[in-house]
Every structure is written in structure tokens, then in C-alpha cells.
A protein has these predicted regions:
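SDR active-site strand-loop-helix element
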Residues: 19, 44-48, 85-91, 135-137
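Adenosine-cofactor binding site in Rossmann-like domains, unifying the SAM/SAH pocket
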Residues: 11-34
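NAD(P)-cofactor binding segment of oxidoreductase domains
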Residues: 44, 58-86
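NAD(P)H-binding glycine-rich loop region in Rossmannoid oxidoreductase-like domains
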Residues: 29-66
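Amphipathic terminal alpha-helices
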Residues: 260-276
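Catalytic helix-loop patch of NAD(P)-dependent Rossmann-fold dehydrogenases
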Residues: 65, 69-73, 80, 93-135, ...
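NAD(P)-dependent short-chain dehydrogenase/reductase
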Residues: 123-172, 178-179, 185
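Mid/C-terminal beta-alpha module of Rossmann-like enzyme folds, strongest
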Residues: 5, 183, 190-236, 241, ...
């Protein structure tokens, strides 16, 4: 999902060596070390992660293996080979109790196994790799036909059903993979190491209002979106009430700020529909 758009965005300017899970298992420390010895990278973008929040909750050992041990393997290899590391994380590292979006200065307090594993990954990167970037995303969408996240699911379901119920008490910042990949490029080129949020701008939006906007852009008039409480859909993993962030570090560094999420959402949906 993010990997495809990152390769497309960065390929013209950089020599990239993308690895699928089949090609490189980050939980295999020997394989990671062999890869570094063979290719001697200057910079590593660490995208490998178990991101299914509920699967992480029900399979904590797997989440630990991939998101924590895997990240440690990559970070140690970066330190041994003097490579800088770009680590992609999530705004879910915050507990979600705040009334306003989170900044990079706020203290993480993750609740779910997934969020805890990603935050531990952040700590590992910060401890082991001197030259590092930690870049947090919001509610990700993008990746074309490979997209299986919320936006793509709503698009598909709304064309199949007369009515959808969507929770209206969880808020976040949609983050377009294309814009996130561009932010990674700007952050890396800045040489200003540290922690960044890179989310599309705009007011935090509920899942319900986001779903309504999705069907509006797609001009799907046959499906009604109805609001419900998240208590209606009990899930294995807890979700933050507020999962939105602000791009204070980008602004402080004088780097480009991602465009409004509504504009990005419109471009993504119209592009997806035109290619389907």
C-alpha cells in the first residue's frame, strides 16, 4: 500500500532497492545482516510492519516479532553499517483522550498491542540509530487496487448495500499515501533528524463523516450512511477516540505541509474510480 506509492514517488530521484516480505523477512536477523552487507545502503526506509490492529491484539507474539524484534534487527544493522533510518509509525501511539490533535511534543501512551509495538519500535530506533527520522501517519488511504483500508472498504461496500452504519465517536486525520511519501522525501532531504507527524491537514473527522464524504465524492446515491456508537461494534483492540495530529515539526523545519485531506481524498477517489 504505502510501499508502492513510496517507490513511485522516490524512484526518479533515488536508487531504490525495495524488498517484499518474501524477499526479506525482518524477523530473521541473519537475513537482514546479509542484505545490508550485500547492498551497503546509505539510507533505510523501514515500512515492514504488522498493521492489522485486531490481529496484533489476538496474536501479540507475532506483533512483537515483526514490529519490535524486526525493527530492532533493522536498527542494529543500520548502526553497524552507518546507515540512516526512516521509521514509519502511527498517531495511535497516543491514548486518544485529548480534546485536540496531538503534536510531536505530546507524550505517547499507547493502549493497543499494535500501538505499543509501534511505540516500542520508535524507542528502539531512537536508542540505536543516531541518524534517524520517525514519521507518524494518521488514517492511511491510497495504494490503488491494493488498498484494503477504510476508504476503499467504504467505496466497495457502498456500491453493494443500501445502508452502512459507521461509528461517529472516533476522530482522525486521513493521510494519503502519495502525500505521505512526498513528506518522507522532504524530511529525509532536510537532514533534520527527529520525530515528525505527516498527515493531511484539516479538522479532525469522524469515521462517519469521512464515510459520508467518500460516497459523496464517488456520487453513490443508493447507499445511506448512518451513525452509530463504537460500542455497537466491539473489537479485540481498543481504538483511540482522538487519532489526529498536527504537523508542527514540519512547519518548524520549513518543510512543505501536506494538503487538506478533503482535496487528497477527492484526487484519490476520482483516480481510483477512473481506473476501475
Amino acid at each position: 500500500m504505502l510501499g508502492c506509492d513510496t517507490v513511485t514517488t522516490l524512484q526518479p530521484a533515488y536508487k531504490l532497492l525495495p524488498f517484499s516480505h518474501d524477499a526479506l523477512d525482518v524477523t530473521d536477523s541473519a537475513a537482514v545482516e546479509d542484505c545490508f552487507r550485500q547492498h551497503q545502503p546509505d539510507s533505510v526506509l523501514h515500512l515492514a510492519a504488522l498493521t492489522n490492529v485486531d490481529r496484533c491484539q489476538t496474536e501479540p507474539d507475532r506483533a512483537t516479532a515483526v514490529n519490535i524484534a524486526g525493527t530492532r534487527n533493522v536498527a542494529l544493522a543500520c548502526r553497524r553499517h552507518n546507515a540512516e533510518l526512516i521509521y514509519v509509525s502511527t498517531l495511535a501511539v497516543f491514548n486518544g483522550d485529548a480534546a485536540e490533535p496531538y503534536s510531536e511534543d505530546d507524550t505517547p501512551n499507547p493502549r493497543s498491542i499494535y500501538a505499543k509495538s509501534k511505540y516500542e519500535g520508535e524507542c528502539i530506533v531512537g536508542e540505536l540509530v543516531e541518524r534517524h527520522f520517525i514519521v507518524r501517519a494518521g488514517w492511511m488511504f491510497g495504494g490503488g487496487i491494493e488498498d484494503k483500508k477504510f476508504v476503499a472498504k467504504i467505496l466497495d461496500l457502498a456500491r453493494q448495500r443500501d445502508e452502512l452504519t459507521v461509528v461517529d465517536d472516533k476522530f482522525g486525520c486521513p493521510t494519503y499515501t502519495v502525500d505521505f511519501a512526498n513528506a518522507i522525501r522532504h524530511i529525509s532531504e532536510s537532514r533534520r533528524f527527529g520525530v515528525y507527524h505527516a498527515v493531511n491537514t484539516g479538522s479532525p473527522v469522524s469515521r462517519f463523516d469521512l464515510a459520508r464524504r467518500i460516497v459523496e465524492i464517488a456520487e453513490i446515491t443508493s447507499c445511506t450512511i448512518r451513525p452509530v456508537s463504537s460500542d455497537t461494534f466491539p473489537l479485540p483492540a481498543p481504538r483511540p477516540r482522538m487519532e489526529a495530529g498536527v504537523n508542527d515539526a514540519l512547519a518548524a523545519a520549513g518543510l512543505p505541509i501536506p494538503r487538506p485531506w478533503d482535496e487528497a481524498l477527492f484526487d484519490y477517489i476520482t483516480s481510483r474510480l477512473s481506473s476501475s
